[in-house]
Amino acid sequence: MPSYPVSTVNTPDGQVNVLQITDLHLSSHVPASDDETSSEVAVCQYSFEAIIKQALSKEIRCDLIVVTGDLVNKVEPAIYDHIFTVLQDTGIPFACIAGNHDVTDETGEDLPFYQRTLITRAADPRLLSRHLIESEHWQLLLLDSSITGKVEGEITATDIDWVREQLASCTKPALIALHHHVLPVDSEWIDSHMAKNAEEFWQHILPFENLRVIINGHTHQEQTRHHQGVTVYSTPSTCYQFKPFEDNFAYDKKVRPGYRWLQLANNGKVASWVERLDT
């Protein structure tokens, strides 16, 4: 079994194949096979486990799994225990960071969002912050963009200083992973809950030419954007999806749960694509 958290990834050919999953939103630690209900709770549980099984059945070698936040829909240690057991059982190195739901519970989930009460929760200690993973040719920088008791995110001054130090001290191509998006996705409602100091973040990191890629969750949709030489990937949820380019909250019921592959090549180039759950 790989130790947690992973700090180095070594592969036979130097290339690192990363499986990104995000926004699991689990509300139960009961395995999907033991839950005979058709509730949203059971659906999220099933799709998480089914996506892991489907992704790892592909011909592509998986070298690292990165989980970019919102592992749970309510903060309970037993749910994290279950998630970490599923990931450990793959035998593949993995790393998890927090999203807003990992540090915030909601009351009145049946109410419109603005009528709900947000409750501050402490992050599970297994969720990583300012964590470096290195391979022969790449460096992956994992950030915790969550704010306890809030939906929106923030990259703190300490986080920014740490990223700048890593990018300055190591010339390897770099990937940053965090939960909240740092470029708008043209949906007013979710863009009001992005990383609130994204512009400041960009000002500090753009001078570093070795920064190639940023990956995030939070948006529950697939998007690819480019900003001054940096490619930014938003990745679908392993559960339910949000309708893209909608200013008001809306589910996208036409697309299935998904996950993202990233191939980090030895020459600093990146290939990435999204796959959807088959059944």
Swiss-Prot record:
UniProt-listed Enzyme Commission number(s): 3.1.4.-
InterPro entries: Calcineurin-like_PHP_ApaH (IPR004843), CNP_phosphodiesterase-III (IPR050884), Metallo-depent_PP-like (IPR029052)
Keywords: Hydrolase, Iron, Metal-binding, Nucleotide-binding
Cofactor: Fe(2+)
EC category: hydrolase
GO MF annotation: an example: nucleotide binding
UniProt KW Metal-binding keyword: yes
Cystines in this chain: none
Highest taxon above the source species: Bacteria
Keyword GTP-binding: no
Residues binding Fe cation 2, per UniProt: 70, 100, 179, 218
Entry's cofactor comment: Binds 2 Fe(2+) ions per subunit.
Residue numbers binding Fe cation 1: 23, 25, 70, 220
Positions with a binding annotation for AMP: 25, 70, 100-101, 220
Signal peptide feature range: none
PANTHER family (alphabetical): CYCLIC NUCLEOTIDE PHOSPHODIESTERASE CBUA0032-RELATED (PTHR42988:SF2), PHOSPHOHYDROLASE (PTHR42988)
Family designation: Belongs to the cyclic nucleotide phosphodiesterase class-III family.
Name of protein: Probable cyclic nucleotide phosphodiesterase Psyc_2036
